[in-house]
Amino acid sequence: DIDHIAKTVADVIKISKATGGLGVSVTKLRATGSRLATSNTTSTGPTPFAKIMDTAIRAIQRGGKKKGALCFYMENWHYDFPDFIDWKHNAGDDYLRMRTANTAAYISDEFMKRAKKGEIWYMFDPKETPDLVELYGAAFSKRYAEYIEMAERGEMKLWKKMPADQMLRQILVALQGTSHPWLTWKDSMNLRALNNNTGTIHMSNLCTEIA
């Protein structure tokens, strides 16, 4: 929803001005190429919207003393996660890089199990899989497997796959080269949360203390 995105950008600016550090989840943003029914066009994906916030925290300094601080979180089943891994790379198109904000991968136990076993990892458009972001633990694994079956039957419009251990290597290579993305753990954070009856935790804070 474009209004929600615009409000998030405004909130980032206001909180940064008030010296706050932020964590922002971009997992719910549509995938690149996702069909927009209202305009009969396709989405540009999370990167351009993240770039707006990245630029904003550089422009709006915290208390006028130092640059704003923000960390973007994305779950690695998102269709654009391979691009997310590259957000902090020094090389490449500056429009596709985050020069001020940090990045953190929000990883499920299901992914780590698949990486350990050498299995395949699937990535989806959150528009087609809106409940995945709200699920964790066994419920996530069950629903994720259902979406995989749907994709292989040709019932999903936008999806791709790769070996899970290959994705893990890409994350670790980027982490070694750029110190990003940080690794945070969706299942651990939600299963151990004292208030997990109030809803799903979609991210950590700026410095990932609760991860």
Segments (PLM) and residue ranges:
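Active-site cavity-forming subdomains of large catalytic enzyme subunits
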Residues: 1-211
